[in-house]
Amino acid sequence: ANYYDKMLDELIAQGIEPMVCLEHYEIPAELFKKYDGFASKRVVELFVKYAQEAFKRYSHKVKYWFAFNEPVVVQTRIHLDALRYPFYQDSKAWMQWNYNKALATNMIMKVYKEGGYRIAGGKFGTIINVETAYPRGNSPRDLEAADKYDLFYNRIFAVTFDENFTRA
């Protein structure tokens, strides 16, 4: 924590507005081994506690917060592409990770809003790596397939924000 204290202070001293992303692929290995990462509600609970501690410690210095960067990538590489450990495809696990990351985002947003951590002009969001899908043709099935792709890769994370909350 001392490192981050000094780093944030130096950024501010140099006139640089700090932005904090709470997770960018770096879930602790122990949580992955023990719970299969964000497949578990326990990891969601722990992530929300982690976010709350970060808000307590740094909300007086940081206005811009992000729950996740590219929230669909890790589980896609693990459970759809099977490019990372445990090297098998599991679409149910992939969808559970997506759901739990959206759930965690909502829970963290609630903590941020209701905990008084939002300083003037502060914003909270998620950095989405938009995955574009074009329908193969104009048939209803092609249009539906493109819509579902967009839902599972993009909108699941974008729609976690209510219309009354300023997006980052």
Regions found by a protein language model. Name each.
Residues A1-A168:
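Non-catalytic scaffold segments within catalytic domains of secreted glycoside hydrolases
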